[in-house]
Each structure stands twice: as structure tokens, then as C-alpha cells.
Amino acid sequence: MSAKKTAIESLMGERGHLRTSHEMLKAALEIESRDDSFVPFYIATANYMEAGMGRLDAQDVRMLSRLAEKLGNMSNDEEEIIAEVHRRLDGNRDHLKKFLTCRDALVADETDQKNIANFESVSNAYIDYIHNSMGHHAPSTDIAIKLFDDNDWNDIADIDPEYFSGEQKLYVTQLAVRPDSVPLGKEAAEYVAEYRRDREE
């Protein structure tokens, strides 16, 4: 992408990569002819999502804190909008903890069929939660876009070259062990391009 990304576009790109990661996992779990060769992909995906979801959580907490500061004396509706996102984040942390526990069991024994079945079951539940509770545009984001300036978005995005370097390595590892039958998702740049098009309409 030729133009330099803004902080909010960096956020969109990060979340696009994360979405691609869990959508590839969803696609893998829908393949009937799965076998033990999928396990390295499961582990690599969990490693990527551990980093990505941890960062998403920290960014969203900063955004909600800044939003509360900007709003000041909030209405009941505004308080509920922020509280609802906190509830989603709490649920995401609970699912992520279970997901990573299953990942750790797989790392300890990649051939144990019970470990594989548990990981797949917990992964399906987690992906359902992400799609139903984390994947749609929240009213808090609309308010933030109206109230925040570039400095706010820079603080929230916390653009960190060291993190991006590590994230890229995790993503490359995930792709390297992706079974051929699992389709590739979109690149982060495609999500940023979509965001730019939406802003122009």
C-alpha cells in the first residue's frame, strides 16, 4: 500500500491479520478429512492469537478509558455502551484462557487424540464467540471516531516495531504449517484498503 498508514489504519490492519488467522482456523475445523498433520497449524494459530488477542485487549482497554475521559459526565446509554464492550472483553479473556490451555496440552502431546478433540471443540466455541461478540462494529467505535484526534489514536494503537516484527514471525510460521486444504485469508493491507474505501463513500 503506497500511502503511509494512520494509527487507526494500523489498528485495522492488525485486526485484519487477527481475523484472517482465526478464519483460517475456522476453515480448518470445517474440513472433514482432518488428521494429525493439522496439529502444528493448530499450535501456530494459537500462538498467533495469543499475541494478537492480548494486544487487541490492551488497545480496547485504552480506548475505553480514553473514551470515558472524553465523554466526562456520561449518559446512561453511554455508560452502557462502554460497559457492554468490557463484558465482551471479559468473555474473550475467558475463552482465550481455555483455548490456550488446550494449546498447551497439544504442545505437551501432539498425538493424543483427546487433546486434539478438546482443542477443536474449544476452538469452535471460541471462534463462535469472536464472530458473535467481537467481530461486529460496536457503537463505542463510532463515538471514538467522532471524539478522538490523531494523538488519541496514536496512544491507543501503540505502534511498536518490535511487536510487529514478532507478530510477523508468528504469522509466517502459521502460514508455513498451514495444510494445503486450508484456504488463505485476506492480507492485512486488504482490510486497510477496505477501511479507506468505506471512509471515502
Language-model regions, residue ranges each:
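Small-residue-biased structural context
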Residues: 1-54, 59-201
